[in-house]
Amino acid sequence: MDEISIRSHWVSAWSTSPIDASLSETGILDRLGVAVTDVSARTAVQLTAGGTHVRLTLSNVFGVLPLHVAACTVAIGADDARGIEPDTLRTVTFGGEGHVRIAAGTSCTSDAAALPVTAGQTLTVTVFYRGINAMRTIGLIGGCSYAELGNCTRRPLLHLAIPMQHTAETGAYEVIPALTEIDVLAAPGTHACVIFGDSTVANELPRLLAARLRADGIENVSVTQAAIKGDRLVADGVGRAAKLLGGAGVKRFERDVLAQAGADMVLVKLGANDLIHPHCRSKQGLLTPVTFAQMTAGYRALADMAHAQGVRIWFCELTPWKGYTRNLFGRGDDIQWSPELDALRPELNAWFQSADCPADGYIPLDALADPDDPDALIATYTTDGVHHTPAGQRALAALIPEDIFRETPKEVHP
């Protein structure tokens, strides 16, 4: 073992949670089923930790056929997300080879590539996929991706790039093929905090929080993302966009959070969709309202899984949603807020603060609420009554207490 490996360890510096992009019964995901025929995908992401080397995790967890990676490179990104800084280009290998075939239902982590990176820097990953496959495993938040025909892994700038974005009535999505995690070989004491949740944190929160911590002198914490828009705590997604909404939080927690390199903290903001979706017109007959016991059992399961691996866990306040109507698929208002429909949310927030809750802490977010109407968010903080504007995201990042990151981290898994 060389001196670097003795002194340093792997820490996740970026992540996204995969979803199944295969076709649904109604075809709502047709344009997300990414066809792959001798094409390169270039993804630019912002790292939240620095190190001397990088490694990648590519996932085919939802695939039914092998995924053939014929070539792969990493480089520091250029100002134009389609480009790279050519002098920083590095070849990525897998078990010493420049190619790999990822079996259906599995993921693959690359060898280390020697490329010094810093927190806040853009890393660009370019993967050349050979052969005809149906790429079913994609992320939908956290990067900017382009596709171009042929092997473009060493090309300084993509000239015929096709943006891999998807805009639907359920929201805007950044399609990220196969790439689910980027680790850095970081200095001793560096560790990762994972933000786990739904669309209220499937935004710029990880980057904003990481930048705030660095500005405050906390430079040994990366902040990564494990949020899926529409995700629920205790049940899988249902309805026209079921696969788009991800699997239940209690099912994906181990894969999306606990498996991340160097993760020893998780902030959970998940549960609003469990409360809202059963009352939506579009989901009538598909769901029954959840109970307090079901929800607290779900949160206990997360805490138990986290603590079993030595990971500390905080539950964030479930924020107000008055004014949210969820007008999807052109059907008009899908739900109308009422005190009765919102009754369980304050009960759960109270439980988070009780001695009965097994979490390591609670993060109050009541400062996001309208002082004149605490059941609603401040108007400038929300786009639709539940989701956060850039100002709302910055406000949320500012409310996460700094002291939880100043505690000395325990030894974390590589």
Question: Model-flagged regions — what are they?
Answer:
Residues 14, 37-43, 58, 66, ...:
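Conserved SGNH/GDSL esterase-like catalytic core that processes O-acyl groups on lipids
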Residues 37, 174, 245-252, 291-298, ...:
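Soluble or luminal CAZymes and related metallo-dependent hydrolases
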Residues 269-270, 316-317, 365:
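Alpha/beta-hydrolase-fold catalytic nucleophile elbow
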Residues 276, 319-414:
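Catalytic His-Asp segment of secreted/periplasmic serine-dependent ester chemistry enzymes
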